């Protein structure tokens, strides 16, 4: 058997971080088992689903690097209405579905009664049964189609995350599978899609647990082999509440990109939300695929920890090739009015500073003074700069100007003799020198910084 999983987002605005975690686990499960990971766009909400929202999903999947095996044949539910109608007709013909002519008022009265009695909402008055007389069909009413849910027994499955789950069928409604206008409903479309796509493992959020018995009963009615189900726990915000834009939480995956998070780091972090492999915190996706097993997924909700996310991101920045980092940092430098990054070469700058940043935006800031001297803070000036320091910088500039070989080692060799002559410690040279050349007291080793900036530019800045 070839393992087939799917990710089935609804294009109604943005790609949610919880959805990406679901996609990641489905993707990793398929890759671990040498199977297929498929993408389906559940766009039957015609009022909210837009082409722009579809592109947001596709772009988000591309950004995080979750490749799907039906890239040339993504399933769109709106293109499958004929297929859904075909299956509904088959269910009607077999007696596994029926027409219901209840009005909104009748359904509301049933709902209120069911709430009081704790029973299923719909009283099944239009459900055909042996010896039962159905009401007279009202004139001018377009019926919905309901699925004939079994009245006795239980629907149960062994959830790959939550374990044994059993739901009495008497607690389930005869759910609507086609609306009065003929459009199919969510729970029905999902079943037909999973069946036609050959999905063997449905891995999704645990907000779908209540849908599962309904879908299992429909799958049985159409003669399908049941997939296995695994329901993932929610991701909560740092306060332990549901992630929400209204609460100020970052929810869209593209927003994390704007925050300077690498896609590899984002996936690494999301993998650790609800899943563990010993004490391993930092790993590649190749390792994750090798290690991943749904039995290691906790059924309890996970909580966001932005501090941990940034730490993991910093670790990934350290191992990212400088050339790749340069392509990611250049646009951020352009936003900071730095467009020329040849002298010094940005890759060389990144090699020196990338272990000082936990996100790409901070990394871009760390590169600025290599190209343009920054304005020092008042605190740095008060602490490290005075007339004596200014005069000392001019004297040291003469030593720098006399260097024939401009490199880190040659610059470093000037420090001790100069400090001895001036009767000062290195801090009295290094900190003012950083301010004079870079405009900040926080830089890597100053000899390496000067070597990269270049002799002509260093002397110009000191003497400005």
Swiss-Prot record:
It is an enzyme of class 6 (ligase). Coiled coil: none annotated. It is found in: Cytoplasm. Its EC number is 6.1.1.17. The keyword Ubl conjugation does not apply. Monomer. This is Glutamate--tRNA ligase. It comes from Neisseria meningitidis serogroup C (strain 053442). The gene is gltX.
